[in-house]
Each structure stands twice: as C-alpha cells, then as structure tokens.
C-alpha cells in the first residue's frame, strides 16, 4: 500500500500525492549496457534522461536521448527497453494522467549565488539565489536529483532534498530561494490551462496569476 505524503506539497516515489496532481508517481532507473525493460504502468508515461545518454527501444524503433531530453511512452508502441550503451545513465520515469497540451520538461541546475536583479516578481523572504519568483498556466513538478535547499510555494516554504517531488499548483508563485548544496533537479510542467501561456510568467509583465487555490 502506498503511504500518504507527510506534507501536502512534497511527496516521494511511492507516496500518495495530493488528489489534484496529474503526476501520480515517479521512479528513478539506473541504466547500464544491458537492456532493461521499462514497464508501462500508467495512463500517461514520460521518460526523462537525468544523466548520461541512453537508447530507448520500442516497436517504433530506437531513439538515443541525452541528459535533459525526454520520450513519451505510448502504450501502442510498447514494449520498451532502455540501455546506456558502453556508459552509465539515469532516467526518471513520470507516471500520471496529464493532457495533450503541455508546458516544458527538462533538467535544471542551481548553486549558491549572490542575488542579482532578475525579471521575477518581488519577494519578501530570505533569498540567496538568482532564481526568479514566477507562476505558470499549468501545474509543475520539481524532482530533486542532487543537493538540498529551500523551495517557496505561495506563502509556504519547504526544505527539500534528494528524492523529494514538489507539486506546484497552477498560478501559485514558486521559487528556489536558498541552496545549501548545488541542486540538480527535473521539472515537468503538465497540462496547460486558462490562457495556456508557457514559460515563466510574472505579474509585473503578464498580469495577475490565475491561481487554483485548491491545488496546495
């Protein structure tokens, strides 16, 4: 049985996320030179490479992917296997029920930094990074791959570490305000809603956020 997340906004692989989440689970998979089956286990599934390069094989053929690239795993094209060739690689598999119009997906890195003027919205909390406070016209999920720091979502802040997934509801401002050790993370912006704008949005440029208050 999957356990309930201890915090509404942060969950880990195998936890039960909040009911509003389109991301229902995630899993890290380490790859070697031996082909490894990647089972289809959800309505929607996406494989994101988080380190190295790998080759994903399916009924459609083979696709080589490098860090930051992803592949949507359509059940009609299964079964799927993946290997890292002569090297090593890690992939992150997202499971869920998102739609067809999506935001961005990839890998980000952030270290301790002296704040510099950024295009984000103004903040009133301690901040030591040049990451910008912003919102989206979709939900977003951050999975911490390396490092630790402080994430701010709306009026709440959370300490995050390796293996944490931060679920960020549509319209809620969010920020990676402090980093205790260099952070590497994966991000996935799921179904676009409302005005369906993509990318980082700021109230001083794009107008008031379309906040979904129940998504906390």
UniProtKB/Swiss-Prot annotation:
Keywords: Plasmid
InterPro entries to which the protein is assigned, alphabetical: Cupin_2, RmlC-like_jellyroll, RmlC_Cupin_sf
Disulfide bonds: none
Pfam families xref list: Cupin_2
Residue ranges annotated for the Cupin type-2 domain, each copy included: 125-176
Lineage: superkingdom: Bacteria
Protein's name according to its UniProt entry: Uncharacterized protein y4oW
